């Protein structure tokens, strides 16, 4: 029996959460080795496990993979979630890059200065409503299929639905004007593997609060 992928990161969302989502959607059981201190991170660095001295790191198929995009590409390819040809992979890459851009904007709200938060949150909401969600609604409307690419579940669908849940935490009304996106969210969320991941007690991580942010600051020294 193949060993479970082992994920090295803190017990928080961060850069690892998309990897957790993708493995869960693929129905892959995983093991997590949490960093609990800066010394834990130093140990990984000192034993040569981190090529570029940073996490996330995933042990899978005899490799110690770092760099989030490389890890996601490998998992998507391994579990047939990365399209059937170069054109489909190009579309998946294009969509996921847009998703990453917006996800990073949302995550950065957590660490911005308190006096800037309201203005920056309003700007992010404006971009969600007027740039990103209309773009993905347009994609689905253009081909009237159940999934973003090739009428088949791909990494892009999973990544987008993960984003929907982050946006919902920010403002649950933002998706209301986009019926095809709402339908996609429901469709993906009801897949047995994803539905299981969305249940309490799974390896999905909760939103970051002040306590978990402080823990991250100590581990990653920022």
From Swiss-Prot:
It catalyses: RX + glutathione = an S-substituted glutathione + a halide anion + H(+). The modification N6-succinyllysine is found at residue 4. One of its GO terms (cellular component) is extracellular exosome. Its EC number is 2.5.1.18. It comes from the Eukaryota. It is an enzyme of class 2 (transferase). Glutathione binds at residues 9, 45, 54-55, 67-68. Its main location: cytoplasm. GO terms for biological process: glutathione metabolic process; xenobiotic metabolic process. CDD domains: GST_C_Alpha, GST_N_Alpha. GO terms for molecular function: glutathione transferase activity. Residues 3-83 form the GST N-terminal domain. Gene3D superfamilies: 1.20.1050.10, Glutaredoxin. It is found in: Cytoplasm. InterPro entries: Glutathione-S-Trfase_C-like (IPR010987), Glutathione-S-Trfase_C_sf (IPR036282), Glutathione_S-Trfase_N (IPR004045), GST_alpha (IPR003080), GST_C (IPR004046), GST_superfamily (IPR050213), Thioredoxin-like_sf (IPR036249). The modification N-acetylalanine is found at residue 2. Expression not detected. It holds the Pfam family GST_N. Keywords: Acetylation, Cytoplasm, Transferase. Residues 85-208 form the GST C-terminal domain. Homodimer. Belongs to the GST superfamily. Alpha family. This is Glutathione S-transferase A5. It comes from Homo sapiens. The lineage of its organism: Eukaryota, Metazoa, Chordata, Craniata, Vertebrata. The gene is GSTA5.
């Amino acid at each position: 029996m193949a060993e479970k992928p082992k994920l090295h990161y803190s017990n928080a969302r961060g850069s690892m959460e998309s990897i957790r989502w993708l493995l869960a959607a693929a129905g892959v059981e995983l093991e997590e080795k949490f960093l609990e201190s800066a010394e834990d991170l130093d140990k990984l660095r000192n034993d040569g496990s981190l090529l570029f001295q940073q996490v996330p790191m995933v042990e899978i198929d005899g490799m110690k993979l770092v760099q989030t995009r490389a890890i996601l590409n490998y998992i998507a390819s391994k579990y047939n979630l990365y399209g059937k040809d170069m054109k489909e992979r190009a579309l998946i890459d294009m969509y996921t890059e847009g998703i990453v851009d917006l996800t990073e904007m949302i995550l950065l709200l957590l660490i911005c200065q308190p006096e800037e938060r309201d203005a920056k949150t309003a700007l992010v909401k404006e971009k969600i409503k007027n740039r990103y969600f209309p773009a993905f609604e347009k994609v689905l409307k253009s081909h009237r299929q159940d999934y973003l690419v090739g009428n088949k579940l791909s990494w892009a669908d999973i990544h987008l639905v993960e984003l929907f849940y982050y946006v919902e935490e920010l403002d649950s009304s933002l998706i209301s004007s986009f019926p095809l996106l709402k339908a996609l969210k429901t469709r993906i969320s009801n897949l047995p593997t994803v539905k299981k991941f969305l249940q309490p007690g799974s390896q999905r991580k909760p939103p970051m609060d002040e306590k978990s942010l402080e823990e991250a600051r100590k581990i990653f020294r920022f």
